[in-house]
Curated annotation (Swiss-Prot):
Protein name in the entry: Myosin-binding protein C, cardiac-type
Function: Thick filament-associated protein located in the crossbridge region of vertebrate striated muscle a bands. In vitro it binds MHC, F-actin and native thin filaments, and modifies the activity of actin-activated myosin ATPase. It may modulate muscle contraction or may play a more structural role.
GO molecular function, one term: myosin heavy chain binding
Keyword set includes Repeat: yes
Keywords, alphabetical: Actin-binding, Cell adhesion, Immunoglobulin domain, Muscle protein, Repeat, Thick filament
Family the entry assigns: Belongs to the immunoglobulin superfamily. MyBP family.
Gene Ontology cellular-component terms listed: M band; myosin filament
Tissues of expression: Heart.
Listed Pfam families: I-set, THB
Organism: Ambystoma mexicanum
CDD domains: Ig
Domain of life: Eukaryota
Keyword Repeat: yes
Length: 510
């Protein structure tokens, strides 16, 4: 399926379905793979589904759905399969063998095909199986198997977290002899949701008989919280509380030499995330962080790049980080252009995809330097610079420490202009060296903030001096004295502050 993205704001989400309801994204494994590619020249996404070692049961109607924001489109197609003529006999029990490696892709269980082959094996006649509705239940009549057995097997069909194949049915015999110890045995298989409880019930012929319960061949010990044994008349009950994935196993009830077996499947709930991954565009060497926040505890999160899973052993450039059970991160410390691509985070029942574009660093031109400022106290100081790329971000630092905006300090980035504004300048706090450092570039633009000092000398206010010059009587302009006699002039002088008296004779000071 090809999707044109030239008119789309975000990458489209494509899902594949078989029939009306089966999401093939939950069936990805060694027999079914989903791939996607992107052509930057034509801006076309190509989504592909690959079926490996196809079986006749894969035949049917398929649907592909593409969703992007408010746009939706879908297309339907049919797949026809031709079964090989050399059928041969099939050992149904060997097909149900559970592997011990515990991996998800250890095998896949195709109940539709197995039930058909089992009918052929037991009755040697062709049969037709019907699968309709949701969930799928397969019905049929057979002299070799009861309808309840078919329902239990079909009940397991579509489990997404199956990590191995059934071991229980391997031990089933073609012709089971009638049990003398059990009136009613365990059903072939049970299913329970994670966190719930389940009861396994058998009926014994002897009401005084003692039974043993085993899990994967090991005796189960009774406990108050996890395993509870009950004996009510002919019934023997094993209750398993708070089921986890560790309880997904084979169980058996033993009376003397007789045993009955069952298989318990613990189904994980579908997980979701509060926010999808976001597309990112960074420069070479700039740190990348993808964040995923899951809705439930215990979710197994898997990261992929272009459809290939990222593991700790294979990805030296990637780092996985968890913050509690809710948040998980994919970190790329020093990305290169090769790290560009589609990144996917997956968990049971949910996935999200984002694009990462890593670009080479361009040459950044400085169109306007940061100028030194000289201001007075309580004035406004504005540092401003302009660079050639409006997408370049950066930080302001003062004396080597990052400037944090507050009520007085404002930082703005408008287009190519970066501005730092300081209101009500305080000499002790704001004076210093300021620099703007653009992200991803090894240089900075610096300036100084200085203050204009105004010196004022304080002169205390003084009263004008007061001088009292009292001359007794009218003073003559000319005084005549007989030569040889002494001249005495009495002039009373007072004042505030005390005046200094200077006598002069002509132009000479006496």
């Amino acid at each position: 399926a090809r999707v044109k993205s030239e008119n789309l704001l975000k990458k489209p989400v494509v899902k594949w379905f078989k029939g009306k309801w089966m999401d093939l994204g939950t069936k990805v494994g060694k027999h079914l793979q989903l791939q996607e590619t992107y052509d930057r020249n034509t801006k076309i996404y190509t989504f592909e589904i690959h079926i490996i070692k196809a079986k006749t049961t894969y035949a049917g109607g398929y649907r592909c759905e593409a969703v992007s924001k408010d746009k939706f489109d879908s297309c339907n197609f049919n797949l026809n399969m031709h079964e090989a003529s050399n059928a041969g006999e099939v050992d149904i029990r060997s097909a149900f063998r559970r592997t011990g490696d515990g991996k998800e892709e250890a095998g896949e269980l195709d109940f539709s095909a197995l039930l058909k082959k089992r009918d052929s094996f037991l009755l040697c006649e062709s049969r037709q199986m019907k699968a309709e509705g949701h969930p799928r239940l397969m019905s049929g009549k057979s002299e070799g198997a009861s309808p309840s057995e078919y329902e239990k097997i079909a009940f397991q069909y579509g489990i997404t977290d199956l990590r191995g194949l059934l071991k229980r049915l391997k031990k089933m015999k073609k012709e089971e002899k009638k049990s003398t110890a059990f009136l009613k045995k365990l059903d072939p298989a049970y299913q329970v949701d994670k966190g719930q409880k389940i009861k396994l019930v058998v009926e014994v012929a002897n009401p005084d008989a003692e039974v043993k319960w085993k899990k994967n061949g090991q005796d189960i010990k009774s406990s108050r919280t996890k395993y509870i044994f009950e004996s009510i008349g002919n019934k023997r009950i094993l209750t398993i509380n708070h089921c986890s994935l560790a309880d997904d196993a084979a169980y058996e009830c033993v009376i003397g030499d007789e045993k009955c077996f069952t298989e318990l499947f613990v189904k994980e709930p579908p997980y979701s995330s509060h926010a999808p991954l976001e597309d990112q565009m960074v420069m070479v060497g700039e740190r990348v962080e993808f964040e995923c926040e899951v809705s439930e505890e215990g979710a197994q999160v898997k990261w992929e790049k272009d459809g290939a899973e990222l593991t700790r052993e294979e990805t030296f450039n990637y780092r996985f980080k968890k913050d509690g059970w809710q948040e998980t991160y994919l970190l790329i410390n020093e990305p290169t252009k090769e790290d560009s691509g589609h990144y996917t985070v997956k968990t049971n029942g949910w996935e999200s995809v984002a694009n990462l574009w890593v670009q080479e660093k361009s040459v950044l031109e400085v169109l306007q330097e940061v100028a030194d400022l000289t201001v007075m106290a309580r004035d406004q100081a504005v540092f401003k610079c302009e660079v050639s790329d409006e997408n370049v971000k950066g930080v302001w630092v003062k004396n080597g420490k990052e400037v944090v905006p507050n009520d007085r300090i404002t930082i703005r980035h408008i287009g190519r202009t970066h501005k730092l504004t300081i209101d009500n300048v305080v000499v002790a706090e704001d004076e210093g060296d300021y620099s703007f450092i653009p992200d991803g570039f090894a240089f900075n633009l610096s300036a100084k903030l200085k203050f204009l000092e105004i010196k004022i000398d304080f002169v205390p206010r003084q009263e004008p001096p007061k001088i009292n010059l009292d001359v007794m009587g009218p003073a003559a302009d000319t005084i005549v004295v007989v030569a040889g006699n002494k001249l005495r002039l009495d002039v009373p002088i007072s004042g505030t502050p005390a005046p200094t008296v200077i006598w002069t004779k002509g132009n000479k000071v006496g």
